[in-house]
Structure formats: C-alpha cells, structure tokens
Amino acid sequence: MILEKEGYAYDDLTLVPRVISNIKSRSECDVYTNGNLPIFTAPMASVVSDKNYNEFKKNGIMPIIPRNININIRKEMMEYSWIALSLKEFEELFISKSHEIKPNKTYHICVDIANGHMKYLYDICAIAKDYAMKNNYILVIMTGNIANPGTYEWLCKFNLNNSYKVIDYIRIGIGGGKGCITTSNVSIHYPQATLIDMCYRQKKYYLKYTNKDVCPKIIADGGIRNYDHVIKALALGADYVMIGSLFAQCIESTGEKYDGTNTKFDVNDYKSLRIENGGVFGYYNEDGMKKKILEFEEKKNTGYYRKYVPLETLALREEAAVEYMDNLYENDYLNLSKEQYLGQCTVKFFGMASKDGQISISGEKTKTAEGITKYLPIEFTLSGWVENMVSYLRSAMSYCDCFDLKEFIGNQDLIPNSISEINTVNK
C-alpha cells in the first residue's frame, strides 16, 4: 500500500517570516536553555570521545560518549555526561547490577541501537526505570532511532500508561546520516522534515488532551548538512538536533586526520588553528610569522614540525601562508610542493554501523554493514561553527518574532520550495 502523503526533506522546505516582528535586534533572541544550545553530538567514534568532550561542552553542545570508549570509562563519566550504551550493556548495568549504581544521582543514558521500533527495548527501559526508583537514583533515557510517526504516538501512550515517564528523549530519523546506507540498501526511511512535523503534531495533541508531559522530547537525528537544516528541524518541532558528520569536520573531532599529502597527523593545540579558504591554517598575530620561522629553524631536525607542518605553519592570510611556504621551500626545509602544502586536510568519518564502526566497538566486523566510511574535508573549528550557528539561529528567530526557543520550536510556518529547488538533499 502506498501512503498518499507527500514527504519532505529539509531542502524541500523554507521558513516563512512573520508578517511583523517586534524584535529590534537579533541579539534579543535567546538560543540557549540552561547554558546549552539545542544540539547533541551523535555518539560516534569519529566525532567525540572522553578526550575531547569538554570542547563540545564549553561551546554549548551536549556530547554523548560513544560505545567504542571502554565501558569502565563510560561508567565513570555517566555521573556528569551523557553516555551511549548498547542494549546489552544497558540491561546489565541498570537491571542486573542496578543495586551497584550510586544513589541520589542522575544518570543520562542513550541506548544506542539502530532499530528503535523493538518493543523489547521499551520493556527493558520500563524495568530499568522501576529499578532506578527502587534504588533511589534518577535515570534519564534516550532511545531510538524511529522512522514512523505512529511509533512516536505509541511511545506517548506507553509513557502515559506507565506510572512514570519511561522514555525521556527519542531520536527520530533513519537513513539520513552521511555515514548511513540503511535507506539505500534496506529501503527503510521516512522523509525527515515530514517525520518531525508529524511527531510534533502528536506531541501537541497529547499535551493538550492529557495536560501531562508524557511525550518524549524529539531529537532530529541524521541528514543535517548545513546551518539551515538545524533551524528547519527546530522550526518543525524538534526539541533538539543531533549532529554527526558536520562535527566530524571540525578540527576538534576525534576522527583520524590527514594532510594534503595523505599523511596522518595529530592535533595538539586547538587554539592555534584557523580555517581559511577551504583549508586548515595556523593562527598567527602580526609578529607570529617571523617568530614561527625561527622556531621551525631551531626544531627542523627533530621531525616534530616535519610531521605536523600542514597544520602548524600556515598563516592567518593565504598570501602570508604562500610567502612563508616560499621561505621554507626555497631553503629545502620541507619536502612538499606548495600545492601539496596548501592542500585540503581531511578527516576519516564513519557510521557506527559501518565496518570501521563495528571494529571500533568490538575489535571485529560482526555483521553486514549498514554504514560507510568517508574522508571529509576539515572545514571548521568548533567555536567558529557554533558562532555561526548562534548568529544564524538568532537571525531566523528575529524574522519569526521569537524571543526564545520556546516560542520558536514547532510554532513556525514552512512552505515547499519551487519544483526546481526540490530534492537537492545531496547537492
């Protein structure tokens, strides 16, 4: 049976401004809730870990520690950070060993499985919530992923029929992520913009007719390619947006990074980096050029600068970078051409259901992969991306006469683009 309903992706729609806005400046718009943006990191090995999660936190992004991190480390971190667990890990930790959990604390857990349509998942979550109350701790549960508005309605009823809210957050969206091939190979998907809209309609219905907060918070997961997608997801009714590949393209991500010569490098000093002209460049002040040349001359034989030079020797402006490169190249300090030296750095990004993702978790490929590995250009510093995101979101809210996220989320009109603009998700 073919459903006679049009489904929209983010790029199929555009946000309509209010007739009149009472906002005088975008600076009046508050895009934060309790100090955080409405954004989670995807729990992906090539995005976030126990080593860099604070980079996200200090930029107002909520990190989720992925399943490739040792379980003992995740157990330690769950007292102050979201962590991801497999269903088996979740069942063991919060049911079999629930009596070992420290009382009087709150734990934020993402049960990270691909198929959020399994009833068994929610039955286990209900038991875990019951154990949490008996053992005097608070368990906040995120599950997913789902790709049917009816499943969201079922979860609202599920929460309503229990004496407590079992599922607090739900990730919606299957197959839209850059590292996911579920849709192309398994044919499971629901157009993301329409999915958010339909789930939000259910949420409004239950809030109106039950006067209870029984519906899970909506997390739009997958398919975020640009700032406008974040804005559209929120406008359609998502409480939060989850981002994977875009954050992998930040220099602070945990993905393996390669310079223009395909040489793997490490990043030691985030603050010294800057993005310029499509590549990753070093950050310098006016006097930094001469000083850095002297440092390079002193350390050129150690191999350190030879290894890290694609990130640490390029200047703030491309002209200065070329001048500096000429200096190094003419003195034969570097066995790279200028073109190679100024080449685009890349990051290795993979879905957690890919072969690389499975190996990162268990050390071996365990099943047919529904994810892929890609090498993406490094395009941002995290703080730079967040600065842009905050500015663009405030701008959208000012057009829509919204002073805060509560006014903005789910309360906007969107309209389909012209035919020539539709279906450009992979542009």
Language model region names:
Residues 1-217, 245-250, 424:
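Active-site entrance/lid segments in N-terminal catalytic domains of soluble metabolic enzymes
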Residues 1-21, 187-220, 225-427:
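Alpha/beta catalytic cores of nucleotide-metabolism and tRNA/nucleoside-modifying enzymes
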